[in-house]
Curated annotation (Swiss-Prot):
Hydrolase listed as a keyword: yes
Molecular function via GO: 2-hydroxy-6-oxonona-2,4,7-trienedioate hydrolase activity; 2-hydroxy-6-oxonona-2,4-dienedioate hydrolase activity; protein homodimerization activity
Matching Gene3D superfamilies: alpha/beta hydrolase
Stated name of the protein: 2-hydroxy-6-oxononadienedioate/2-hydroxy-6-oxononatrienedioate hydrolase
EC number, as in UniProt: 3.7.1.14
Gene name of the record: mhpC
Length: 288
């Protein structure tokens, strides 16, 4: 029987998760039924969702025999909003722990982009026995760059978009989000803008969280040596959101890790170089 592509609607489900005495309704997409599970964690951009971030990567993994979970972190997608005054990455890690516990999944491969990479590291540091392999793209430490003024131009545009969610500001941010802008269609802009404007509580949640704690993503650099899970680091040479030397920090800090750099690639390697990225990840996961 030929493979049937996954759809957002058919894989959509909700779980109730306790966070500090409050019940949060968390949205996931649960794709495939393989024995090994890959959890994909999205970035922090306005309007981001698990499905939107990884739409070009889901089917190759499911077709290869993996179960794929896409988590909408609190404050994004269809999940509830929450104003966070602590570490956003540790919050996401706790939510993910509750999700996989409810689903009866013991061990996972974690794949995360920007905030998702940082949250994957937070999860690994808290529950190392639950992580099989790590794939980190454009994020993971939260530390300062040695070569690029911080915050970067990309992060400045991202924060401006949260405060003024207009199509003009969205296009400004996306124009440096990827290296080759020819794939940035009007349909993509409209979908992302609709995601943002349909959940203004999520926009407010992020702004208020930053006001409560500007350092939502702490520097995990000093603790990277605690990570023993096999780790693949993927970066775009032209990333204008998180400088490439952050990837070198991960490489230096995580024993046995490997770094793959894409030339002519911005912050969205899994989307900009999807075919190559998918094969890279499949080869990495298949290794003994």
């Amino acid at each position: 029987m030929s493979y049937q592509p996954q759809t957002e609607a058919a894989t959509s489900r909700f779980l109730n998760v306790d966070e500090g005495g409050r019940t949060l309704r968390i949205h996931i997409n649960d794709c495939g039924d393989g024995k090994e599970t890959v959890v994909m964690l999205h970035g922090s951009g306005p309007g981001a969702t698990g499905w939107a971030n990884f739409s070009r990567n889901i089917d190759p993994l499911v077709e290869a025999g993996y179960r794929v979970l896409l988590l909408d972190c609190p404050g994004w997608g269809k999940s509830d909003a929450i104003v966070n005054s602590g570490s956003r990455s540790d919050l996401n890690a706790r939510i993910l722990k509750s999700v996989v516990d409810q689903l009866g999944i013991d061990k996972v491969h974690l794949l995360g982009n920007l905030m998702g990479g940082h949250s994957a590291v937070a999860f690994t540091l808290s529950w190392p026995e639950r992580v099989a392999k790590l794939v980190l793209m454009g994020g993971g430490t939260g530390g300062m760059s040695l070569f690029t003024p911080m915050p970067t131009e990309g992060i400045k545009l991202l924060n401006a978009l949260y405060r003024e969610p207009t199509i003009e500001n969205l296009k400004k941010m996306m124009s440096i989000f990827v290296f080759d802008t020819r794939d940035l269609t009007e349909a993509l802009f409209e979908a992302r803008l609709n995601n943002m404007l349909s959940r203004r509580d999520h926009l407010d949640n992020f702004v208020k969280s930053l006001e409560a704690n500007p350092k939502q993503f702490p520097d995990f650099g000093p603790r990277l040596g605690e990570i023993s899970a096999p780790t693949l680091i993927v970066w775009g040479r032209n990333d204008r959101f998180v400088p490439m030397d952050a990837g070198l920090r991960l490489l230096a800090g995580i024993a046995g890790s490997e770094l793959h750099i894409y030339r002519d690639c911005g912050h969205w390697a899994q989307w900009e170089h999807a075919d190559s990225f998918n094969q890279l990840v499949l080869n990495f996961l298949a290794r003994a």
